[in-house]
Amino acid sequence: QRQMCIRDSDTVDGEEDWLLLFKNETHNHPTEIEPFGGAATCLGGCIRDPLSGRSYVYQAMRVTGAADPHTPLSETLTGKLPQKKIVLEAAKGYSSYGNQIGLATGEVKEYYHPGFMAKRMEIGAVIAAAPESHVIRERPQAGDVVILVGGRTGRDGMGGATGSSKAVSYTHLRAH
């Protein structure tokens, strides 16, 4: 996942140039397994990265996909949560995270299609801005020190995300 910066040609109050940052994440699988937490951390990840770059996150967007939430429980695929539970709990999770920090979500779009019965779509995105003076752009030099902070990383380079590729059984879902 990448952050994209756009140089703002205008100035704020005639004093300082700002950079715009756009960040998005998908949490399809985590939201399907645990809808509240999956959707909440989808937005959380979008917020975390620009904040770590000394920017101000000020707007969010959520785009999701689900099968018909009115699908009878008897038609829920084996090993899957009911669509209604996923839709309602994911909305609560995303909203909870954003509301706790006062982030406005200006655009929400949920697509309903039978194709989402097998795999949910959960996309979060934010817009952030940083004064240009907060961004230091230099080329790395031989001998520069790199400090890595964080938890252990899996072989895929993504740590906790390794769970999103694991097969999940019906027994696993019932246990959680």
Where do the protein language model's features map onto the residues?
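Short alpha-helical segments and helix-capping/turn motifs at coil-helix boundaries
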Residues: 1-3, 7, 32-35, 42-50, ...
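Conserved small/polar residues in nucleotide/adenosyl-binding loops
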Residues: 2-8, 171-176
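Short glycine-rich loop/turn motifs
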Residues: 3, 16-19, 119-124
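Short helix/loop capping segments that flank catalytic or ligand/cofactor-binding pockets
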Residues: 12-17, 22, 30-33, 59-61, ...
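Segments that form or flank anion-binding pockets
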Residues: 22-29, 36-37, 43
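Conserved phosphate/anionic-ligand binding catalytic regions in large, soluble enzymes, centered on
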Residues: 39-58, 150-154
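Glycine-rich phosphate/pyrophosphate-binding loops
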Residues: 56-62, 104
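Hydrophobic, small-residue-rich alpha-helical packing segments that form membrane-like cores
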Residues: 68-174
